[in-house]
Amino acid sequence: MDAIRGEVSDKIPIRLVIGIASRALFDLDESHRVFVDEGVEAYHAYQVARENEVLQPGVAFALVRKLLALNQRIGEAGRVEIILLSRNSSDTGLRVFNSIRHHKLDITRAAFTGGASPYRYVGAFDAHLFLSADPSDVRQALAAGC
């Protein structure tokens, strides 16, 4: 294997696919508090009203930025792919994608589960790793063999 280029001898490219929860990528503590304290309807209204407010980086943001930078450093796009796996619905997830665009993160694929744990989508995206700020989601992903 050529460690620099990330290829095996028959030239099959190796790609690292990482699924990340929106709460790990961005600081969603305040909106999560609204969800827990006030319920789904209030959370929906909160996110939609703030869809153009940029979210601040979360606990895994710096790691994601560095992983995505490997694509430019190696000289070939697509060696590392980050996939957003989110409990948001597609409409409340708009704020997350607006923030992804603002921070210039090369994240183009996502699954919005509408409240369900996103770990179920790790395998569907052939992700090698799942990053989440929710310990329960991580445990479920590990138990499922993800």
Regions found by a protein language model. Name each.
Residues 1-146:
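HAD-like aspartate-dependent phosphatase fold
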